[in-house]
């Protein structure tokens, strides 16, 4: 077909005639009977087919030709539209996230430490004041007074109003002691608990909390600690979490600003004294609660019996948090800062404790060990010297009690302690200076150092029971007589017997 027939309705007619011709020329493709078809019937069929094609052409207005010609173009347009839609959705998502983080980290006067849309949080002072007014209306007198007392404390001592950074002395203590540098210190004025062994806390009948002496460090990526509940009655509420200093310790953690806690009821509190938020399963006796802190992102999370729960606090990077445990009734809680293995496997493997188990400070030497210790060696030598001196003094006292060395009343020549001389000494007048070789000096020195060999004297000196006859001065000296001065003379046996018999006869003769 050429000319106007290619683009007009004639094209369809031509196509129809071609189709009709092909049908007529191929009669074998259609099952027919052996009887010949009349020519009038074939013309009627051709007219019917032409009529149907013309009606379709009129209804679709040339749609057959247009569809076959534009099929490839419409496919490309569909792909382009899909790609542009995907890129547009991504751009919209990026813009929304940018706006969210911009308002989250740059807006002042807004506390947004948790995710948006979570109930139980306050993000500005007006909303908190509205919640406070609603809560005070339904509080009882005791709860209202406790809240007002805590509010007055927070106003007088705002959070982070005192220096809580780790000082140089505290850092050195951590280096020396390791994780043993952390311990719980109860407030003496309001303490209703007792701390034993630095980390074992026993609470009594009233509400109170206890903080550690040191904050959580910020050098590592993650710090983690755990608390195990012992002896918890059903009506006792236990809260484990983190707080800043100063904090009203007569209240549980999580009730006031810059504090968070996981309560034994299964709720959590974050800067919220009025309403708590469901968080996890309730806690009972034997459960272990873990608290993790990521200083770089300011995130705080909890674990229960070794299973991590969702994050609670975000962007708390500037505060110094102290591990805190509180209760309103009798219970016992043991805390593990890393001195033992954690129940949370990840923290146990990655060593997320507050400090190493052992510091650089060496332990004291064990008693009874001989590891070349100077202290133990000197003590052993001192004991030997003391025993030898006691033995020498005992021997000298025994010898000095039996052997009497007559001192000289006149001074002699100067000689060494080992020089023994028994020669007669010249008489020197008493008004002259006796000098170093005087008998007085020798007498004083003689009390400490014997001048004679006691081993030779033991064979020559009589036994201690021997007594010299009366009137004999042998073996006696002034030094030996001095101890007996002031005591009456000892009478002999005969004199004592005679006096006794005389007294008896005299008493018998008297009426």
From Swiss-Prot:
Cytoplasmic side stretches: 1-82
InterPro entries, per the entry: B30.2/SPRY, B30.2/SPRY_sf, ConA-like_dom_sf, SPRY_dom, SPRY_Ssh4-like, Ubq-SigPath_Reg
Topology, Lumenal side: 104-511
Location in the cell: Vacuole membrane; Endosome membrane
PROSITE patterns, per the entry: B302_SPRY
CDD domains linked: SPRY_SSH4_like
Family stated for the protein in its record: Belongs to the SSH4 family.
Coiled coil: none
Keywords of this entry: Endosome, Glycoprotein, Membrane, Protein transport, Signal-anchor, Transmembrane, Transmembrane helix, Transport, Vacuole
Organism: Aspergillus clavatus (strain ATCC 1007 / CBS 513.65 / DSM 816 / NCTC 3887 / NRRL 1 / QM 1276 / 107)
Positions of the B30.2/SPRY domain: 146-342
Recorded GO CC terms: endosome membrane; vacuolar membrane
Biased segments, Polar residues type: 437-455
Membrane topology: Single-pass type II membrane protein
Protein name per its UniProtKB record: Protein ssh4
Residues modified by glycosylation: 400, 499
Main location: membrane
Transmembrane segments: 83-103
Job of this protein: Components of the endosome-vacuole trafficking pathway that regulates nutrient transport. May be involved in processes which determine whether plasma membrane proteins are degraded or routed to the plasma membrane.
PANTHER family hit by this protein: RAN BINDING PROTEIN 9-RELATED
Gene Ontology BP term (one): protein transport
Chain positions covered by the region annotation Disordered: 432-511
């Amino acid at each position: 077909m050429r000319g106007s027939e290619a683009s007009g309705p004639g094209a369809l007619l031509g196509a129809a005639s071609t189709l009709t011709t092909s049908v007529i020329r191929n009669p074998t493709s259609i099952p027919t009977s052996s009887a010949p078809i009349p020519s009038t019937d074939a013309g009627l069929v051709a007219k019917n087919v032409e009529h149907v094609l013309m009606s379709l052409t009129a209804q679709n207005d040339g749609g057959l030709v247009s569809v076959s010609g534009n099929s490839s173009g419409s496919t490309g347009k569909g792909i382009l539209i899909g790609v542009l839609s995907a890129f547009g959705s991504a751009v919209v998502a990026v813009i929304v996230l940018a706006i969210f983080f911009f308002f989250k980290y740059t807006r002042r006067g807004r506390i947004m430490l948790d995710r948006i849309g979570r109930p139980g949080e306050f993000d500005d002072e007006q909303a908190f004041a509205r919640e406070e007014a609603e809560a005070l209306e339904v509080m009882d007198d005791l709860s209202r007074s406790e809240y007002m007392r805590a509010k007055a404390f927070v106003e007088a001592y705002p959070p982070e109003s005192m220096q809580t950074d780790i000082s140089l002395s505290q850092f050195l203590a951590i280096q020396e002691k390791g994780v043993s540098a952390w311990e719980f210190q109860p407030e003496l004025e309001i303490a209703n608990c007792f701390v034993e062994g630095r980390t074992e806390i026993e609470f009594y009948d009233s509400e109170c909390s206890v903080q550690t002496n040191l904050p959580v460090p910020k050098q590592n990526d993650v710090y983690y600690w755990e608390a195990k509940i012992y002896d918890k009655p059903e009506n006792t509420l236990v809260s484990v979490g983190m707080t800043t200093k100063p904090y009203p310790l007569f209240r549980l953690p999580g009730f006031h600003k810059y504090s968070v806690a996981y309560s034994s009821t299964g709720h959590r509190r974050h800067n919220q004294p009025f309403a708590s938020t469901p968080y996890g399963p309730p806690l009972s006796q034997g459960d272990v609660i873990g608290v993790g802190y990521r200083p770089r992102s300011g995130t705080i999370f909890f674990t229960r019996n070794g299973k991590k729960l969702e994050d609670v606090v975000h962007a708390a990077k500037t505060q110094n948090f102290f591990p805190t445990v509180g209760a309103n009734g009798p219970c016992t809680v043991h805390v593990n800062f890393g001195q033992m293995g954690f129940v949370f496997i990840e923290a146990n493997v990655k060593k997320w404790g507050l400090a190493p188990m052992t510091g650089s400070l060496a332990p004291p030497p064990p008693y009874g060990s001989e590891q070349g210790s100077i202290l133990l060696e000197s003590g052993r030598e001192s004991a030997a010297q003391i025993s030898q001196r006691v033995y020498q003094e005992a021997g000298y006292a025994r010898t000095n009690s039996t052997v009497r060395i007559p001192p000289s009343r006149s001074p002699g020549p100067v000689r060494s302690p080992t020089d023994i001389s028994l020669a007669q000494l010249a008489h020197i007048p008493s008004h002259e200076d006796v000098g170093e070789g005087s008998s007085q000096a020798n007498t004083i020195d003689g009390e400490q150092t014997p001048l004679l060999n006691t081993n030779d004297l033991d064979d020559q000196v009589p036994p201690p029971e021997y007594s010299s006859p009366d009137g004999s001065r042998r073996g006696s000296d002034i030094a030996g007589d001095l101890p007996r001065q002031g005591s009456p003379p000892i009478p002999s046996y005969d004199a004592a017997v005679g006096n006794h018999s005389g007294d008896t006869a005299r008493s018998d003769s008297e009426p």
